[in-house]
Amino acid sequence: MSEIIRQVMISGRVQGVGYRAWLAHTAEAMGLHGWVRNRRDGSVEAVLAGSEPIVSEMIARCQRGPSAARVEAVVAEIAQPDVLNLRQPGERFSILSTL
C-alpha cells in the first residue's frame, strides 16, 4: 500500500488544551509519522504520513481532538515528502516549536 502525506491545519480553541500532545500520541499509536506544532495565529499545523485509510481516519479524529479542544475547522492538503524533514532525528512523530 502506498504512503500519502497530508498537511493539516486545525483552527478553533486548539492551543493550551493539550492538542499537540494528543495528536502526536494518537498519530503514533495509529502507526503514522510526521510532526505537529502550534502557529502564532492560534491554529495547530500537522503533517501526517502513512496509508490512506489511516491518514483519513486521523484527519477525522482531528475534527474532534482532545476533550478540552473546540475545533472549528480542519483543512487537509496534499504535501510533499520534504515536509517530513522537519522531524527531530530518530523520531517517527515530533512536536515542533511554534512557528
UniProtKB/Swiss-Prot annotation:
This is Acylphosphatase. InterPro entries: Acylphosphatase, Acylphosphatase-like_dom, Acylphosphatase-like_dom_sf, Acylphosphatase_CS. NCBIfam families: PRK14421.1. Belongs to the acylphosphatase family. PANTHER family: ACYLPHOSPHATASE. Keywords: Hydrolase. Its EC number is 3.6.1.7. The active site is at R20, N38. One of its GO terms (molecular function) is acylphosphatase activity. It comes from Rhodopseudomonas palustris (strain ATCC BAA-98 / CGA009). Residues 5-97 form the Acylphosphatase-like domain. It holds the Pfam family Acylphosphatase. It catalyses: an acyl phosphate + H2O = a carboxylate + phosphate + H(+).
